[in-house]
């Protein structure tokens, strides 16, 4: 048998000292906690509001940010002021209205919010977009406006999520979106 070198004997002493002071179960428990904690770290919420002015969202949809000029005359148009951050079919074109779902659909209990400028009175209003669920997608008046949209890690400000979860009677199928005013934002 070869004689241990200084490095080997140092590691052996450290291992024996650690083994005499800690039990195997304690070590395995701490190791397991560390591994689980490391795996769950990316799931923690991230708030990046301080860097919002650096965000450059991709311009997509019917109207780009540069060309978006809200109007207050035609609620069935994608540039109607209440639709500044809508992503989906307007219920106005599907048998409903700005604030009510078409017959045969149910209002989702969840919503996403945006603040939209009304050119008619010069005020900014808080809009709580809510999906109407329970029928197949309407497919008329599809608008994809991204003004004020934030990434999915801020879901209450993201319009890419189908908000039909939580609807009664398992009505999880998206049909259209309503745009009720919650109050003044300014």
Swiss-Prot record:
Gene3D superfamilies: Methylamine/Aralkylamine dehydrogenase light chain (2.60.30.10). The modification Tryptophylquinone is found at residue 112. One of its GO terms (cellular component) is outer membrane-bounded periplasmic space. Pathway: One-carbon metabolism; methylamine degradation; formaldehyde from methylamine: step 1/1. Disulfide bonds join 78-143, 84-116, 91-176, 93-141, 101-132, 133-164. It comes from the Bacteria. Uses a protein-derived tryptophan tryptophylquinone (TTQ) cofactor. There is a cross-link at residues 112-163 (Tryptophan tryptophylquinone (Trp-Trp)). Predicted to be exported by the Tat system. The position of the signal peptide cleavage has not been experimentally proven. Keywords: Disulfide bond, Electron transport, Oxidoreductase, Periplasm, Signal, Transport, TTQ. Its EC number is 1.4.9.1. Residues 1-57 form the signal peptide. InterPro entries: Amine_DH_Ltc, MADH/AADH_L_sf, MADH/AADH_Ltc_C_dom, MeN_DH_Ltc. It is found in: Periplasm. GO terms for biological process: amine metabolic process. GO terms for molecular function: aliphatic amine dehydrogenase activity; methylamine dehydrogenase (amicyanin) activity. Methylamine dehydrogenase carries out the oxidation of methylamine. Electrons are passed from methylamine dehydrogenase to amicyanin. Heterotetramer of two light and two heavy chains. This is Methylamine dehydrogenase light chain. It comes from Methylobacillus flagellatus (strain ATCC 51484 / DSM 6875 / VKM B-1610 / KT).
């Amino acid at each position: 048998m070869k004689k241990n070198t200084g490095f080997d004997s140092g590691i052996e002493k450290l291992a024996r000292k650690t083994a005499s002071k800690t039990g195997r179960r304690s070590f395995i428990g701490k190791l397991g906690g560390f591994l689980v904690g490391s795996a769950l770290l990316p799931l923690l919420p991230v708030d990046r509001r301080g860097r919002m002015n650096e965000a450059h969202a991709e311009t997509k949809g019917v109207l780009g940010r540069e060309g978006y000029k809200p109007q207050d005359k035609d609620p069935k148009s994608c540039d109607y002021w209440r639709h500044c951050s809508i992503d989906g079919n307007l219920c106005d074109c599907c048998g409903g209205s700005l604030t009510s779902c078409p017959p045969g659909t149910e209002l989702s209990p969840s919503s996403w919010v945006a603040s939209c400028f009304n050119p008619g009175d010069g005020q900014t209003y808080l809009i709580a977009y809510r999906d109407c669920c329970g029928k197949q997608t309407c497919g008329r008046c599809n608008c994809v406006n991204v003004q004020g949209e934030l990434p999915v890690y801020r879901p209450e400000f993201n319009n890419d999520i189908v908000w039909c979860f939580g609807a009664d009677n398992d009505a999880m199928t998206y049909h259209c979106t309503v745009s009720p005013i919650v109050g003044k934002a300014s």
